[in-house]
Regions:
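Divalent metal-cofactor coordination and adjacent catalytic microenvironments
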Residues: 1-153
Length: 153
């Protein structure tokens, strides 16, 4: 686990309860490990500079909040079966339309994946830190220690 509840509440200023946090933290960490081709794991986290560790932890927290939104959409959709929200009604030939726009947007798995990747890309974009280039999202595994951009500065 890359982040604890204290970091989530105090540094990230997250709003979820500890129980809700625990529900989503491991999945968030697994998504980052997958997207970084296992460059970021429990065993490698402390090998990065503090600035990058902070970004990784922030990314986990942002994913936790997003996964909670997805879960709320699933819960809302299942509640529609019991408590349907009427969007429109027609009396002649009886036609009823239910509002599912909010939940359908968040239930779309492609949309979920796009949102998750967007968060990861924003938090873990390639950068130079202290003259070393870090590209955690590259699909090419290479050990380039120097940064051409940093050496120009």
């Amino acid at each position: 686990m890359f982040v604890d509840y204290e970091f989530y509440k105090e540094t990230f200023k997250g709003k979820l309860s500890e129980e809700e946090f625990d529900k989503f933290v491991n999945l968030s960490c697994m998504k980052i490990t997958k997207e970084t081709c296992s460059r970021v794991t429990d065993g490698t986290l402390n090998n990065f500079p503090n600035e990058l560790i902070l970004d990784i932890k922030t990314c986990v927290c942002a994913l936790i909040d997003k996964l909670k939104i997805f879960q709320d959409a699933i819960d809302t959709a299942s509640n529609f079966k019991q408590e349907k929200i009427v969007k429109s009604q027609t009396a002649g030939a009886v036609s009823v339309t239910y509002d599912t726009s909010f939940s359908s947007y968040f239930l779309d798995s492609k949309n979920q994946e796009i949102q998750i990747k967007s968060i990861i890309n924003a938090c873990l974009c390639p950068r130079c830190i202290n003259g070393k280039f870090y590209n955690l999202l590259s699909k090419v595994i290479e050990n380039s220690n120097s940064c051409k951009t940093c050496s120009l500065v």
